[in-house]
Each structure stands twice: as C-alpha cells, then as structure tokens.
C-alpha cells in the first residue's frame, strides 16, 4: 500500500461554504478534463448572442442617420444657392454658385487654361491684420 492515497483530498462541505463556492470548486475541478465544453463553448455562445443582440441597435443607428440625411435631386441642389436663410427665393445669391452643364465641358475648360504662365499675387489683408512681411 502506498504511503499516500491516490484519492484527492476534498474538504468537507460545511454550512459556511456557500453554493457559489461549491459550484466554483466543481467547475475548476472539471475544467482541465473538458476545456472546450466548459470554457470555449460558453465564450462562443456569448459572442454569437451578443451579435444577435447588437444587430437591432446597429440597424437603429443607420435608420436614424438615413432619416437625417436625405438625397437631393440635382434641381434642388441648384436651387439651394438662390434661397435666403428663411427659404425666400431671390433674397441672397450665393457667390460661389456655378451652374456646370456637363463634366466634359468643365474638363475642357480647365484644360484650356494656361497653367505654365502665372504670377503670384498677395491676398489683400484686412485693416490691422499683420501682412506677414518681415
């Protein structure tokens, strides 16, 4: 007979040991024997359940964004430059508004410019603003 018994020692369950301690003890004892079943499988299930739970939240996010951002037709976009702050037409004109007929026309107009002969001009400063000259 060996000096030490092969049976592992397990302390007696007392009234002071709670249910959580007993469950944890059995979990730790069985984890080396079945690592995937007790650790990997619950982890994978939590990830899958989380993806199902977060799908409606992501859909809600994109639906709110779609309600906020609306696609304008080309005619509405052109009219944006002619409206005032309250929507009255003809009150203020946007100086940067240009009507571009066709992309090809714009391309050829830009290609016709002479980009080799240019002269650097200083921008006129406001009164009291330093001009940056030393």
Swiss-Prot record:
Q: In what way does this protein cross or attach to the membrane?
A: Single-pass membrane protein
- Tell me the GO BP annotations in alphabetical order: mitochondrial cytochrome c oxidase assembly
Location in or out of the cell: Mitochondrion inner membrane
Can you name this protein? Cytochrome c oxidase assembly protein cox16, mitochondrial
* Any GO CC annotation of this UniProt entry: mitochondrial inner membrane
Record-linked InterPro entries: Cyt_c_Oxase_assmbl_COX16
So what family is this one in? Belongs to the COX16 family.
Q: What is its main location?
A: mitochondrion
The UniProt transmembrane annotation reads 35-55
GN (gene name):
cox16
Q: Name one Pfam family in it.
A: COX16
Q: Where is the transit peptide?
A: 1-12
Q: What does this protein do?
A: Required for the assembly of the mitochondrial respiratory chain complex IV (CIV), also known as cytochrome c oxidase. May participate in merging the COX1 and COX2 assembly lines.
* Entry keywords, A to Z: Membrane, Mitochondrion, Mitochondrion inner membrane, Transit peptide, Transmembrane, Transmembrane helix
